[in-house]
């Protein structure tokens, strides 16, 4: 099996490094100059410095070079996925598209697999998600992820081909649950970061993580997912990692919000758009999504952290 990776950011590059030791990998970068530099220097100094690309990785900016790949990993931001895939449906027909981004599209409320399936109906679809940082994968540190695919035979094949000595994949057919877990945990991570940034303490973070997990499961069930999927790697596992580490962009964004500091606008923060998409649906369909709604208000500058916590703590008392 040959693998193509669309997106030469930190995560796409890390996957190329991990898989490239045993599998032929073609890594596509949008910028031709960046692709040439990476191909020549064997390093992504802009996005993932300090890690050498294996000999089995070819870097290109020419989409035609991916024609021979059986599997394409889509490592592009969720909010840009639709625009990116437009016009590629014929090129990717018959191939397996594995989305590797985590988010909910603001305009439509759709997840990454839903978007890819709509734009590229002649392809097989899956999602790779779970608790992982690009640096850990590139270093070859033990990492476990969820591979979700509705086709059980294809899921088994992908699991075998993409797993290696340091990257272990667990498969599921619950695509909805897997993509929602990865998206929603980013929202909770912003909330936790804001609490710590505002010096509200570790107890507040623990409460937000626990009630956030319940909120994630509630929303996933509303969308037709199996709630138990949110207790696995793609849900709870990713939640724990993202809410406790400053390597998480969403958590760092929350820290900045809580501390009243500026955050680099060039940094992708998937949880911000996801929070707004979820909050909008919660309003329209009377869903109980208090943390997501508060995060959306924080992101849109309609609420500060102190009032956000007051709003959460003043809700009607209830059974757990």
Curated annotation (Swiss-Prot):
Q: Where does sn-glycerol 3-phosphate bind?
A: 102, 130, 132, 185, 238, 248-250
Which InterPro entries does this chain map to?
6-PGluconate_DH-like_C_sf, 6PGD_dom2, G3P_DH_NAD-dep, G3P_DH_NAD-dep_C, G3P_DH_NAD-dep_N, NAD(P)-bd_dom_sf
Q: Tell me the residue numbers annotated for binding NADPH.
A: 11, 30, 102, 134, 249, 270
Per the record, the pathway is: Membrane lipid metabolism; glycerophospholipid metabolism
Enumerate the SUPFAM superfamilies for this protein: 6-phosphogluconate dehydrogenase C-terminal domain-like, NAD(P)-binding Rossmann-fold domains
Q: Which domain of life is it from?
A: Bacteria
- Give the annotated active site: 185 (proton acceptor)
Reply yes or no: does the keyword NAD apply: yes
Broad class of enzyme this protein falls into: oxidoreductase
User: Which keywords label this protein?
Assistant: Cytoplasm, Lipid biosynthesis, Lipid metabolism, NAD, NADP, Nucleotide-binding, Oxidoreductase, Phospholipid biosynthesis, Phospholipid metabolism
Q: Which reaction does it catalyse?
A: sn-glycerol 3-phosphate + NAD(+) = dihydroxyacetone phosphate + NADH + H(+); sn-glycerol 3-phosphate + NADP(+) = dihydroxyacetone phosphate + NADPH + H(+)
Any idea of its EC number?
1.1.1.94
**Which PROSITE patterns does this one have?**
NAD_G3PDH (PS00957)
Single biological process term from Gene Ontology: glycerol-3-phosphate catabolic process
Tell me which Pfam families the record gives.
NAD_Gly3P_dh_C (PF07479), NAD_Gly3P_dh_N (PF01210)
List the record's Gene Ontology CC terms alphabetically. cytosol
Which molecular function term from Gene Ontology is one that the record holds? NAD binding
Q: Where in the cell is it found?
A: Cytoplasm
**Protein family according to the UniProt entry:** Belongs to the NAD-dependent glycerol-3-phosphate dehydrogenase family.
Q: What does this protein do?
A: Catalyzes the reduction of the glycolytic intermediate dihydroxyacetone phosphate (DHAP) to sn-glycerol 3-phosphate (G3P), the key precursor for phospholipid synthesis.
Q: What is this protein called?
A: Glycerol-3-phosphate dehydrogenase [NAD(P)+]
Species per Swiss-Prot/TrEMBL record: Roseobacter denitrificans (strain ATCC 33942 / OCh 114)
């Amino acid at each position: 099996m040959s693998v193509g990776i669309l997106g030469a950011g930190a995560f796409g590059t890390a996957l190329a490094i991990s898989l490239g030791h045993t599998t032929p990998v073609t890594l596509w970068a949008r910028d031709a100059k960046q692709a040439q530099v990476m191909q020549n220097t064997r390093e992504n100094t802009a996005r993932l410095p300090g890690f050498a690309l294996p000999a089995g990785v070819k870097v290109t900016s020419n989409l035609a070079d991916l024609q021979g790949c059986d599997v394409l990993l889509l490592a592009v931001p969720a909010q840009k996925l639709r625009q990116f895939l437009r016009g590629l449906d014929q090129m990717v027909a018959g191939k397996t598209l594995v989305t590797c981004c985590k988010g909910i599209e603001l305009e439509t409320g759709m997840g990454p697999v839903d978007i890819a399936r709509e734009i590229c109906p002649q392809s097989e679809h899956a999602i790779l998600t779970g608790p992982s940082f690009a640096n850990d994968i590139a270093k070859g540190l033990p990492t476990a992820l969820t591979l979700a695919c509705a086709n059980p035979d294809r899921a088994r094949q992908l699991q075998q081909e993409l797993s290696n000595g340091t990257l272990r994949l667990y498969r599921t057919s619950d695509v909805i649950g897997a993509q929602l877990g990865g998206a929603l945990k980013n929202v909770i991570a912003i909330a936790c970061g804001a609490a710590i940034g505002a010096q509200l303490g570790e107890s507040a973070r623990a409460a937000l993580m626990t009630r956030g997990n319940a909120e994630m499961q509630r929303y996933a069930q509303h969308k037709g997912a199996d709630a138990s999927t949110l207790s696995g790697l793609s849900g709870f596992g990713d939640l724990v990692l993202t809410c406790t580490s400053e390597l998480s962009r969403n958590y760092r964004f929350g820290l900045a919000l809580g501390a009243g500091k500026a955050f680099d606008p060039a940094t992708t923060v998937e949880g911000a758009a996801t929070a707004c998409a979820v909050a909008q649906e919660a309003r329209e369909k009377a869903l109980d999504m208090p943390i997501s709604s508060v995060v959306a208000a924080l992101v849109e500058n309609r609420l500060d952290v102190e009032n956000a916590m007051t709003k959460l703590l003043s809700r009607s008392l209830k059974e757990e």
